[in-house]
A protein has these predicted regions:
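Basic, low-complexity terminal or inter-domain segments flanking catalytic cores
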Residues: 5, 61, 92-94, 133, ...
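Pre-Walker A segment
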Residues: 140-161, 166, 172, 342, ...
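Flexible coil/turn residues that form the inter-helical turn or adjacent wing/linker of helix-turn-helix
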Residues: 161, 176, 357
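A conserved hydrophobic secondary-structure block that centers on an alpha-helix together
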Residues: 169-171, 175-183
Length: 783
């Protein structure tokens, strides 16, 4: 609102502003009837946030360019988010796994009608070693098992509050598998269609009207016994409850969109809002202790739950974090104290302590919210920014894990047997991993800007923004108190620190006697043999890229030296050389000027000639045309967005409903024809040589040139032109519209080589740019 006043030259002190949280007729009518003035305290708080974040972002980013690598960035929130991920990764790497043994037993029970049941019980305490577990099983060989106690206690489970921005992001990640940015884009579309309330909010409260509508919906669908009206208070640090919680605009609508993402997210929001006003679920938990005749001090325990009244569970069950252990809920058969049980099998299984779980997008949002870092509107862009390939601080990927053996002792029919089993450990799906660059930047900032990287400092800054919003602090005073010591520290770091490469010495090369070390190079981490000041004149340092899964922090000397065994020539195939190599994007087979990726789970050093030929032939098969259309080949491929077909520079995404590996020629041609027809309808005019086209857009005809869209001028009545009218425009007329919107659109760009800037000049550049912005904004706000 304040920005509109600035642009339109309106006085914010007398200009009225309307507020609505949903795009519905009643909400907008009510807003028009109840206008208010622009809250300049809120404006100042936002200005303070913007200026501070730009100061930190611009100046620290420029420092990183000079000290580490170009195109890196830093920020008050994003750098702390990366730090969380880095610290968790180091915690996992330093975690010492401890083995232990857990005892469980299966008992056969028969009820009065002669029906057989199996109940599972466990020893509450674990054994530290196999000897203790074996001794326990030995004592159970001839034991009688009797029910000692049965404890039944009622439980009540309460529904979760309606969604805030962060809880929606977390739950959509866990239940729907959405990324944070995917959730926000989908929620934005729902909001723009008037289907949900505003999706950037800290509030868990609902309006009286919404509660009334939800109550009516619950009563009509499930009955009045399911209704329990509730009000919720935010548990979030520094919550700003300017809006309602996220809820449907119209509670009686459950089907709203044919677009799958929109419908699924809407259903999630609808169910959560409805459940929030429903009665508690009433459960009954039964705890049974089973005595062991040969060991009176020991017992096994079985637990079960039954739902007496489902309440809100009829609609919605909140999911759990990966970090929280899930507990099996079983129903126990009718049992009585003193009842004897028939042991079918008892096992003592070796288990291992687990390190803390890596962050997912959902759990990272939860942690940032708990620490009071950032705001609902910043979580999605922050996570997207730290995962951008240009920065390369964090990656989200699937890791297959490693095989681990464990021991199992089994007592069955009075005999104890031991066997070794296998499991996969360390597998990860959609977890966030810090890269070497992420770790290097965090260490550099931690060392030189400890205060900014401190979690409590970032949270305290958020509190100061709230104080400014309450009108109790001048925003420019807060900026001044922060900026001067920060800038002094920045200048000191610029002058007194050298370039940072994360160099770590691993040992000495036995052949040359040169130092072996790992460091960050221009295109990523490398192992280097021989520093520039120690190699002989006729020699050059040797370099090797790290393999996937290796890091600068924990690679060993032996692992580093293995990397120099590549590239390795295997021999000739069809009179052409076959070589195994390691590149920036992983290991590969090089053959006939082509590069074929080696699967991630295969060691490139173990690849034989036979396996290399197999990979070459697989590549040939994959690249072979699946069909021909208009005398041009249709080929298959897989990209970051899934499988696709390519024909004549036209890409066709293949839906999961098709078996891509078994796609036949007829289906491939049908998909290409459908895409071709769709593209033909999209273009009204297309000047390929000029790379200019007129297309049918969502809001009418539009011009596309240079990766930008340009609108046609509206007619005298203010209406958009039709497709027929757009078709009559000549190329020169279209060019004139482009130039009117972008005067430099057809100016040829020339590359300018930048001169190297001295340290002294760098200092003045960093000092002056943000300072100018502060003064400009300060004047605007005071005006």
């Amino acid at each position: 609102a304040w920005h509109l006043c600035e642009v339109l030259d309106l006085d914010p002190k007398i200009t009225k502003r309307i507020v609505f949280h949903e795009i519905t007729k009643p909400a907008i009518q009510a807003a028009v009837l109840n206008p208010r003035k622009v809250d300049l305290d809120l404006v100042n708080a936002q200005q303070a946030r913007r200026v501070l974040d730009r100061l930190v972002g611009f100046e620290l980013s420029e420092l990183l360019w000079r000290k580490i690598k170009n195109n890196l960035s830093a920020g008050r929130v994003q750098s702390v988010a990366v730090k969380l991920i880095v610290e968790r990764e180091r915690e996992i790497r330093n975690f010492e796994v401890t083995p232990f043994f857990k005892v469980s037993a299966l008992f056969k029970v028969q009820d009065k009608e002669g029906r057989n049941y199996t109940i599972k019980a466990e020893r509450p305490e674990r054994f530290d070693d196999m000897a203790g577990a074996r001794a326990f099983l030995e004592s159970c060989k001839k034991a009688a098992f009797t029910i000692k106690t049965i404890e039944v206690k009622p439980l009540r489970r309460k529904p979760a509050a309606p969604f805030t921005t962060s809880t929606l992001q977390q739950e959509a990640s866990r239940k729907l598998g959405f990324s944070v940015s995917r959730t926000m884009v989908t929620a934005q579309r729902l909001y723009e269609q008037g289907l949900i309330t505003y999706m950037r909010t800290d509030s868990t409260s609902l309006s009286a009207t919404a509660i009334q509508q939800i109550t009516q919906e619950i009563t009509s669908s499930f009955g009045s016994q399911y209704v329990e009206q509730r009000t919720y208070k935010s548990k979030t640090a520094n919550a700003q409850e300017a809006h309602e919680a996220i809820r449907p605009s119209y509670i009686d609508r459950q089907e709203v969109s044919s677009i799958r993402d929109e419908q699924r997210l809407y259903e999630l929001i609808w169910k959560r809002a409805i459940a929030s006003q429903m009665a508690d679920a009433e459960l009954e938990k039964t705890i049974v202790k089973i005595g062991i005749s040969t060991m009176p001090q020991e017992y096994l325990q079985a637990e079960g739950e039954i739902i007496k009244f489902d309440g809100f569970l009829k609609v919605y069950l909140e999911s759990e974090d990966e970090e929280e252990e899930a507990h099996d809920e079983t129903i126990l058969p009718p049992l009585t104290v003193g009842q004897q049980l028939d042991l079918r099998k008892m096992e003592a299984i070796q288990r291992f302590t687990r390190p803390p779980a890596r962050y997912t997008e959902a759990s990272l949002v939860k942690k940032l919210e708990e620490l009071g870092i950032g705001r609902p509107s910043t979580y999605a862009p922050t996570i997207s920014k730290i995962m951008e390939t240009g920065r390369g601080y964090v990656i989200k990927e699937l890791r297959e894990g490693t095989e681990r053996k464990f021991e199992v002792l089994t007592l069955e029919q009075g005999v104890i047997k031991q066997h070794t089993d296998k499991e996969i450990t360390g597998a990860a799906k959609n977890n966030l991993f810090p890269t070497d660059m992420g770790m290097l930047v965090v260490d550099f900032l931690n060392k030189n800007f400890e205060e900014i990287m401190n979690y409590s400092f970032t949270a305290e800054i958020e509190k100061k923004f709230d104080v400014i919003a309450d009108g109790k602090m001048e925003w420019h005073q807060m900026i001044d108190s922060f900026y001067h010591p920060f800038h002094k520290k920045l200048e000191d770091t610029l002058q007194n620190t050298g370039r940072e490469s994360g160099k770590r010495i691993l040992g000495t090369d036995p052949k040359s006697g040169n130092t072996v070390f790992v460091r960050m190079a221009r295109f990523g981490p490398v192992v280097q043999i021989g520093d520039t000041d120690e190699v002989k004149e006729e020699e050059k340092p040797e370099f090797a890229n790290l393999k996937a899964g290796q890091s600068m922090e924990n690679i060993s000397f032996e692992q580093a030296m293995e990397l120099f065994k590549l590239p390795k020539t295997l021999g000739n195939f069809e009179d052409k050389e076959v070589t195994i190599g390691q590149g920036r994007f992983g290991p590969y087979v090089k053959y006939d000027e082509g590069f074929i990726s080696i699967p991630r789970n295969e060691d490139p050093l173990s690849i034989t000639m036979e396996r290399a030929i197999e990979l070459i032939n697989d590549k040939r098969t994959a690249d072979a045309p699946v069909a021909n259309y208009k005398q041009m080949p249709i080929t298959k491929g897989k990209g970051r967005f899934g499988p696709f077909l390519k024909w004549n520079d036209l890409y066709v995404n293949v839906s999961p409903k098709y078996n891509f590996d078994q796609l036949d020629a007829r289906t491939a041609i049908e998909l290409v024809v459908a895409k071709e027809e769709k593209e033909a309808k999209r273009f009204i005019n297309n000047w390929e040589e000029e790379k200019i086209s007129v297309q049918n857009g969502r809001w009418g005809p539009t011009i596309f040139f240079g990766k930008k869209y340009f609108n046609f001028p509206k007619d005298k009545e203010g209406n958009r032109i039709t497709a027929e009218e757009a078709a009559n425009y000549k190329l020169e007329e279209v060019k004139a519209i482009i130039e009117a919107n972008d005067p430099k659109a057809f100016t040829k760009k020339t590359k300018v080589t930048k001169a190297k800037v001295s340290t002294t000049n760098a200092k003045s550049t960093i000092a002056k740019k943000p300072a100018k912005k502060v003064i400009t904004i300060k004047k605007k706000v005071k005006a």
